[in-house]
């Protein structure tokens, strides 16, 4: 059977934790940051787990993760 291809766009956006969960970056921290408070920007800096409803889709895009 041939190798499965990884979706490169997904590979750049998601990482796997040691326990097999997927981690993502939060949105709204790229530009237009002047009016956002420092507390909010700090909160957006932290990583977030992928929602359980999306895990199956992400794992199909990353067959070797």
Curated annotation (Swiss-Prot):
Gene3D superfamilies: 4.10.410.60. Pfam families: Ribosomal_L35p. Keywords: Ribonucleoprotein, Ribosomal protein. The keyword Protease does not apply. The keyword Secreted does not apply. One of its GO terms (cellular component) is cytosolic large ribosomal subunit. GO terms for biological process: translation. SUPFAM superfamilies: L35p-like (SSF143034). GO terms for molecular function: structural constituent of ribosome. Belongs to the bacterial ribosomal protein bL35 family. NCBIfam families: rpmI_bact. HAMAP family: Ribosomal_bL35. This is Large ribosomal subunit protein bL35.
